[in-house]
Amino acid sequence: MWRDSLCAAAGYALGAGTRLRSVLSSRKLQP
């Protein structure tokens, strides 16, 4: 049961990291 929550947390963190990275890259592209 804890493994499911751990996997969900990992997926959420990965998605948040990707979203943050895309926002930073887009912000860096636009002066």
UniProtKB/Swiss-Prot annotation:
Described purpose of this protein according to its UniProt entry: Inhibits lactate dehydrogenase (LDH)-mediated conversion of lactate to pyruvate in mitochondria by competing with mitochondrial LDH for binding to NAD(+). Also inhibits cellular lactate utilization.
Gene transcribed to yield this protein: MLDHR
Species whose genome carries this gene: Homo sapiens (Human)
Localization per record: Mitochondrion
Major subcellular site: mitochondrion
Disulfide bonds: none
GO biological process, one term: negative regulation of oxidative phosphorylation
Keyword list, A-Z: Mitochondrion, Pharmaceutical
Entry protein name: PTEN upstream open reading frame MP31
